[in-house]
Swiss-Prot record:
Residues 45-307 form the CoA carboxyltransferase N-terminal domain. Its EC number is 2.1.3.15. It catalyses: N(6)-carboxybiotinyl-L-lysyl-[protein] + acetyl-CoA = N(6)-biotinyl-L-lysyl-[protein] + malonyl-CoA. This is Acetyl-coenzyme A carboxylase carboxyl transferase subunit beta. PROSITE patterns: COA_CT_NTER (PS50980). Residues 7-21 have a biased composition (Basic and acidic residues). Residues 1-26 are annotated as: Disordered. Belongs to the AccD/PCCB family. It comes from Caulobacter vibrioides (strain NA1000 / CB15N). Keywords: ATP-binding, Cytoplasm, Fatty acid biosynthesis, Fatty acid metabolism, Lipid biosynthesis, Lipid metabolism, Nucleotide-binding, Transferase. InterPro entries: AcCoA_carboxyl_beta, Acetyl_CoA_COase_Trfase_b_su, ClpP/crotonase-like_dom_sf, COA_CT_N. Gene3D superfamilies: 2-enoyl-CoA Hydratase, Chain A, domain 1. It holds the Pfam family Carboxyl_trans.
Amino acid sequence: MAMAEPQDPKKGDKKTAERRGGGWLSRIAPGVRGAFAKRETPENLWVKCPDTGEMIFRSDLEAALWVTPAGRHMRIGPEARFKFTFDDGQYEALPTPPVVEDPLKFSDGKPYKDRLVAARKATGEPDAMAIGYGKVGGVDAVVLVQDFAFMGGSLGMAAGEGFIAAAKAALERQVPMIAFTAAGGARMQEGALSLMQMARTTLAINELKDAALPYVVVLTDPTTGGVTASYAMLGDIHLAEPGALIGFAGPRVIEQTIRETLPPGFQRSEYLVEKGMVDRVTHRKELPEVLGSLLGTLMMGRKRQAA
């Protein structure tokens, strides 16, 4: 009887090797695990519509100028404003003057200086005002944008200096000025120094008027408090984005004070157009064309007066 050839114990048989984890399964396992592994998703990939709760791709919102399918004009920062307002998105960023920070050494549980640091980190802006210079509808213009993301767009010394710097730039270049407003009011951390900016910005607007240079205001959501009581309502023409809250005190404060229910849409831009406080409600995508047309007409009238 023939004897079976002894098997090399080092090699073993194929099945034994596979059972020990050296077969085909071990070769494909990494790929299988990779296919089903949890993938990292960017946190800001989606944005929730505040009206409908719908989740919207951030890229789609950016393409729509941050207007939701439901028509909500969402709050946006200076860079986005500049890019769609200026012709071909081309503009020169103008500096805002530095100011003394935290002169009152204010703290409301958190030091004011710490709040400034946090706001700058979140927005990438030195304060609530940003200035750009370029062409709007073919007309040279200085554009000022108030950033609500920076401490509620509040009006403080830096914001006041920013507004005055924009007005000076318009005067030096003899061009019109556009202001996009968005604020909760004066910056409480600066006390009376903040309230002073209401008078200072008003004087800057008077200089524009004395030079017969157009000053156009675009009221965005929200524009309230001391900003409404000063430069936001001193324009030659007032445009407003749809649904923007515009007023001095907020509706809840008013209701609590007068103890009456306010009418629907009270203090919204559409309501204010009906009452004559705003000249026109303009969709964000139409703003560049409308602004360009207004500036062209106003500057043409200025040239005729000069002649």
